[in-house]
């Protein structure tokens, strides 16, 4: 049996752009992608803390060090620049590996710079 587990997360990213006329996807600063091991074209879930919207899309690389978090295409209708989002990537993990799998979680500041790296979350934790 395989379980779908969170393996990477960018917590409280700030949307910097929303580009309706782009083909689709989410553009993420490549430094942030590397920090949590998300790769280009990988599927992610985006949760908007401001309006409760949830969507799935794929990732394209943004300029390193830019802090870019840009929702493209139809997804641009679900966010506004300045919105706080959580970007989550899941992976399939075998039953034997479930308790060995350690997620990479980057907590971001308002400029999308990493302020803390976590490997677990406690219930009721506020960041």
From Swiss-Prot:
Cofactor binding: number and manner: Binds 1 pyruvoyl group covalently per subunit.
Broad class of the protein's primary localization: cytoplasm
Binding, substrate: 57, 73-75
Short name of any one Pfam family annotated for the protein: Asp_decarbox
Signal peptide: none
Pyruvic acid (Ser) modifications at: 25
Subcellular location: Cytoplasm
Catalytic activity: L-aspartate + H(+) = beta-alanine + CO2
Free-text description of this protein's post-translational modifications in UniProt: Is synthesized initially as an inactive proenzyme, which is activated by self-cleavage at a specific serine bond to produce a beta-subunit with a hydroxyl group at its C-terminus and an alpha-subunit with a pyruvoyl group at its N-terminus.
Keyword Nucleotide-binding in annotation: no
SUPFAM superfamilies: ADC-like
Coiled-coil spans in chain: none
Protein name as catalogued: Aspartate 1-decarboxylase
Gene encoding the protein: panD
